[in-house]
């Protein structure tokens, strides 16, 4: 199963390279998204077949991956529906993180600090919203992604293991990718922003899907030692 994960991750990275090299062909973007969604589904089935005890985590992660895929399809067509679907995917990721550890004060403190930084950035003169509702969408989205990052970091701080490390890394890349998306859409002066956005977005989703496999292996090893 590790081989399957690595092959599919390599396929995503290769497709992502050509997606950016060929001037962001939409079909290649959707292909990348489809692959990480399929990888998540494979790991979900593997978790079920190996009778993992915390199936709610895997189902929530799969839901997050699916809505990320759907958001990829929608956001190039309509920004607000696409962002809404992405936000829903992030909510499922936060829920999944909560099935690893319950929400603690540290998670809220980290997430709150990140959100405050996002608010300051979104109201700075650098960022221009031609349509006012876009600012509201970005603020709501920032609250969700900040909560996601805060929970991931909090989980890792309390319990440093391969699963929480993988998820924390994925969440950070996700946050950075979203930041670059805002820079590309609402600042638009950095030519490298689209590449930075997609260059970190798909690796983030790869790690999200891969974290499901990492947790399966980790929990199975713990069960064998008992």
Predicted segments, located by residue:
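Polytopic alpha-helical membrane-helix bundles and their juxtamembrane interface segments
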Residues: 1-226
């Amino acid at each position: 199963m590790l081989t399957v994960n690595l092959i599919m991750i390599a396929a995503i990275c290769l497709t992502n390279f050509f997606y950016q090299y060929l001037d962001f062909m939409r079909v290649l973007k959707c292909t990348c998204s489809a692959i990480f969604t399929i990888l998540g589904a494979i790991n979900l089935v593997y978790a079920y077949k190996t009778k993992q005890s915390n199936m709610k985590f895997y189902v929530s992660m799969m839901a997050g991956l699916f809505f990320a895929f759907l958001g990829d399809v929608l956001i190039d067509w309509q920004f607000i529906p696409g962002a809404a679907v992405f936000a829903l995917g992030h909510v499922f990721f936060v829920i999944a993180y909560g099935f690893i550890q319950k929400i603690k004060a540290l998670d809220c403190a980290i997430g709150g600090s990140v959100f405050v930084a996002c608010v300051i950035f979104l109201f700075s003169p650098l960022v221009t919203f031609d349509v006012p509702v876009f600012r509201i969408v970005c603020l709501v989205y920032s609250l969700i992604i900040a909560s996601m990052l805060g929970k991931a970091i909090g989980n890792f701080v309390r319990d440093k293991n391969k699963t929480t490390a993988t998820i924390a890394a994925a969440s950070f890349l996700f946050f950075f990718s979203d930041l670059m998306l805002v820079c590309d859409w609402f600042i638009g002066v950095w030519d490298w922003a689209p590449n930075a956005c997609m260059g970190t977005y798909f690796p983030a989703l790869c790690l999200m899907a891969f974290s499901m496999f990492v947790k399966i292996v980790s929990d199975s090893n713990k069960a064998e030692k008992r």
